[in-house]
Amino acid sequence: MIYVVMFIRIAKQKRGNKLYRHLQIAESFRDPAKGNAPRTRILAHLGTVEGLGEEQIEKLIAGLQRAIGVTPESLPHLLSARDYGHIHAVGGAWDQLDLSTVLNDAGVRGDASFDAAALIRMLVVNRICDPCSKLALLDWLESVCYEETGRPSYHHLLRAMDRLLLVKETAEPLLARKLVAGSEKLDLVFYDITSTYFEGDRSLSEDDFRRYGYSRDGRFDKRQIVIGLVMTREGIPLCHHIFPGNTVDKTTVGRVIEDIESRFALDRVVFVGDRGMLSDDNLDLLLGKELGFIVAYPLRRNSFSREVISGLRKEFDRKNDSEQFHEGVRAEMRFVVAYSPAIAREVKAARAERLGKADAWIKEVRRKLAKPSGRGRVPTPQGTYDRVRDYLRDHHLLGYYNVELNSNKLSVTKNRAALAWEDTIDGMLMVGTTDMESRMEDIVLRYKELAEIERGWRSLKSTLLLRPVFHWTEKRIRAHVFICVLALQLERWMRRKLQGIASVPRAVEILRRIKIGELEVGGKRTHIPTAATVEQKELLKALGVRPIPASLSENRM
């Protein structure tokens, strides 16, 4: 059998200093007379590429196409290519949980003439995929393929936010039941607060809830609000609360406890938080309501912690590398002290390094005070004293040194008592609890799970861009925070599905590479996705989202 393949060939020939490219029509075949060896023969010489020119070559191509009935109009034209895969995945996760129905059950639609739940879905998908302002979202829709609804008006987006805020009290318990259904037992809730600040002073009134207060972002020069978040042990938010920016942490706990009791059908609940937030009054409130708690006690500048640890310190085997636990009971309160030799060594080494750098810096500063170089400003004892204190304070080392200035003489010595106590508590954690039955290891583990809420704050502030806030009225600010918390809820649900495969931000970036191309063929338009890779298919399968469709109809775009 003879196999023949025809093709265009460019043969190069050099004559003197010139290179000629000859355009030929050739065919390759296998010659049976030569043992089916491959051969090439020239069917036609069309001239040189330089002699024909670009225009003649294009006419030649067009003529060959006409010979088989192909016209420029019948060729496919790619009109646009927009991001799609991440939109499909995040929107599919929302749909799998049927969150639009949950919001409608809560009454989000009301008497609105538009589908408020669909617009909230859009806002949440945008917050996870490409967070931006509500106004910028309209431009974002031009760069992605969002198939579930048409282009909304900015006015309708804001009204959808208003509708969401109106049903917050009803919607949060319904959303919580949907998000945690069958996945975990709700006997443990974590509570923590953070703050977010605002740029500028627009529209501020005397009773505005944006106030100056303790800033977790270190921006004490900015007005802020305080946000309290109640989470499950898997890091899924149950509800959130917003307080004026000058609210003290521990004053929020009572209101949150009352809210959890009234809105969430929780049986035996253990409240987990930091001791600074759970004041004695708050602990009494929890005990009075027969709610349990697990709290961590500060190990420095706390006489009670010092008393408990001093009584248990001899129980720990410092030569044993395994994690150790010891406990005690006082006034119907159980105290568990955990000790990790590995963490102790790590903390001790890090502190020694910081102290070594500080000692070297202090030595150099004191040398310059004793023997000025004669250049620049001459150091003074008071100025050097201030510099040393500022350096130690900024490096969180001031408590380890005694810095004194007496009769213009600077004295810097180590605080041996403070360092000895640091050596004692390195690698230790002390928690108090009402749980008298669980193993010590489980008590400590439950408290450590509080770190999950810290990761939640980081997601809100970085990945989901809680800040900057492009709203200036209280109700819109509250609605914006609710949208961000909804996005965090969905992101945490997706994270659980993707565990061991990829993080949610990584999955979003991988799936973003799936594009939807808008093709025009013969005057008709169609929307075709790029082929999904094995990795992309695995991510969609893990999320339980339907595969990418072969094409999208015009009315869904």
Which positions does each model-derived feature cover?
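Anion-binding and metal-coordination hotspots
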Residues: 1-3, 7-12, 17-22, 27-36, ...
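Accessory, often N-terminal, substrate/partner-engagement and coupling regions
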Residues: 52, 56-115
